[in-house]
């Protein structure tokens, strides 16, 4: 891609901050309640930016920042372009990764029914990490969009639409290396499938401003190269690819992380120990800055997704490092050692004007037995508020090691459960339990209850609210079970079993959920 001058003028401007509680689009309010009013306050962006500081803990992070341009590239605004949309354009929907997807049910549901199922291709290629087949893996979340008339007309010029193209569309990236556009109503292919080049394990991302689709590759076929790519949806073509980075401090160029746009820039963490910052145009990306880092002499990979509060970005990595980065400068603000591999994405919630982040680790480097450390941290300085230690094990399954702990991303409670945080865990035989949906107090980390599974669970839970503001949590496990749990009590109100591993995380649209499995299928469920 040709080098170009900065895409936008960097000038002083005013940020528009909309303090909005939940609406029909499913926007998350600070307390998780309903309110149709919207308060709009104009505040200079300089007053909203969090300070460019570095706490003593950040000294543990040895880093370099490389800038392409001689001019600074500060964030242009602090808008959450994802939370303000009814679309699901990235993993867990918004920048804070705490969104209400918009799942709604009536009363207390009693059934989970299959509306349709979609079959993916199957890839039998032997890679350095085995045969991946089809369906979806971890995190594998679908994307969802409801297009306008103008957008639908623009897509027609691509020549890629099928007879089943419609207003509501899903996109799923598969382990088989193909990308599928699916009609949300019918479950039929709505565009020609995309060739994504390699195994895709993570969740892609739709650009909230341009018709760009971003996809990170997870495993290379036949020992070839892998990296990250962008597709121009108006052309239905790949228009950007970035493979192995010769300057990376870690030699593994996978990108399982789902990138996000913050302040006009695309931020994309890599498993090569690097955080990338790009300028975007239609079909184009231009790198403007990178941060490369080591902790204790090691450059770990980032499989989790970037969680963002204002100009601070939070992520965990393969060595349990939890790092806060100022996205204006790409410099670390604080660091927290959470002991072990942290692939689950950090989630954030503002309480009394202060951001707090929640995350937990796996039992990987600890050995066959260890602790999943679930923590709540102050997002401004990294100070620990509480820690819950949950015993877990690492086990061998059909010749492969299955780490214990948290692979999923926590769900912050809504409605009548704003005092709870929910998480799927892999106990792997610790306390005689394989998997659990656990509900913890956000105040002190006390375990309120746990729903036991007969298999482990990597899939992230999602919320549904009824007309009485009661929360129901939908959670999947590796045995193919889909459960709807009453958030307040832990009672399983209904469930179904598809018999295939749900590693992937679902999305909610109205009273439906869409999720893929390792068995080559994508399912749409209706909750009644």
Regions found by a protein language model. Give the residues of each.
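Bacterial signal peptide processing site
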Residues: 26-28
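Bacterial N-terminal signal peptides that target proteins for export
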Residues: 2-13
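C-terminal motif of bacterial Sec signal peptides marking the signal peptidase cleavage site
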Residues: 22-24
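N-terminal capping/interface segment
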Residues: 14-15, 289
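Extracytoplasmic/lumenal domain signature
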Residues: 31-77, 81-83, 98-138, 143-215, ...
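Short glycine/Trp-rich loop-beta-loop segment that forms part of the substrate-binding cleft
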Residues: 88
């Amino acid at each position: 891609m040709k080098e170009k001058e900065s895409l936008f003028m960097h000038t002083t401007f005013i940020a528009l901050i909309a303090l909005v509680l939940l609406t029909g689009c499913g926007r998350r309010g600070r307390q998780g309640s309903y309110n149709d009013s919207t308060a709009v306050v104009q505040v200079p962006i300089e007053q909203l930016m969090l300070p460019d500081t570095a706490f003593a803990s950040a000294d543990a992070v040895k880093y370099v920042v490389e800038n392409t341009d001689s001019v600074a590239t500060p964030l242009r605004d602090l808008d959450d372009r994802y939370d303000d949309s009814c679309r699901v354009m990235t993993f867990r929907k918004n920048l804070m990764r705490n969104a209400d997807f918009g799942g709604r049910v009536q009363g207390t549901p009693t059934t989970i029914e299959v509306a349709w199922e979609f079959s993916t291709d199957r890839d039998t290629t032997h890679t350095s990490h085995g045969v991946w087949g089809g369906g979806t893996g971890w995190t594998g979340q679908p994307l969802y969009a409801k297009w306008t008339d103008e957008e639908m007309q623009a897509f027609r010029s691509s020549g890629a639409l099928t007879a089943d193209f419609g207003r509501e569309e899903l996109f799923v990236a598969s382990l088989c290396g193909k990308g599928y556009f699916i009609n949300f109503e019918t479950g039929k292919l709505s565009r020609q499938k995309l060739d994504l080049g390699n195994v895709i394990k993570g969740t892609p991302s739709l650009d909230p401003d341009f018709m760009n689709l971003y996809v990170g590759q997870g495993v290379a076929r036949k020992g070839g190269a892998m990296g990250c790519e962008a597709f121009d949806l108006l052309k239905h073509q790949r228009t950007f690819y970035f493979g192995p980075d010769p300057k990376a401090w870690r030699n593994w160029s996978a990108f399982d992380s789902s990138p996000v746009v913050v302040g006009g820039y695309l931020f994309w963490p890599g498993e090569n120990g690097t955080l990338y910052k790009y300028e975007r145009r239609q079909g184009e990306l231009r790198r403007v800055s990178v941060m490369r880092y080591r902790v204790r002499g090691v450059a770990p990979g980032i499989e989790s997704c970037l969680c963002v509060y204002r100009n601070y970005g939070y992520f965990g990595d393969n060595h349990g490092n939890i790092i806060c980065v100022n996205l204006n400068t790409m410099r670390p603000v604080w660091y927290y050692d959470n002991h072990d591999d942290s692939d689950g994405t950090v989630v954030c919630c503002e309480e009394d004007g202060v951001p707090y982040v929640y995350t937990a680790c796996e039992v990987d480097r600890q050995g066959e037995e260890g602790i999943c450390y679930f923590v709540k941290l102050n997002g401004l300085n990294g100070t620990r508020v509480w820690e819950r230690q949950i015993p877990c094990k690492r086990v061998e399954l059909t010749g492969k090691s299955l780490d214990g702990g948290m692979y999923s991303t926590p769900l912050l409670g809504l409605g009548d459960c704003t005092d709870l945080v929910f998480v799927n865990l892999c106990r792997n035989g610790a306390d005689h339990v394989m998997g659990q949906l656990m509900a913890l107090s956000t105040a002190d980390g006390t375990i309120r209850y746990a729903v036991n599974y007969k298999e482990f669970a990597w899939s992230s839970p999602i919320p549904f609210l009824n007309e009485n503001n009661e929360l129901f949590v939908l959670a999947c496990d590796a045995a193919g079970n889909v459960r709807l749990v009453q958030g307040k009590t832990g009672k399983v109100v209904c469930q179904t079993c598809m018999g295939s591993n749900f590693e992937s995380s679902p999305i909610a649209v109205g009273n439906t959920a869409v999720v893929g499995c390792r068995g080559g299928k994508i399912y749409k469920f209706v909750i009644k």
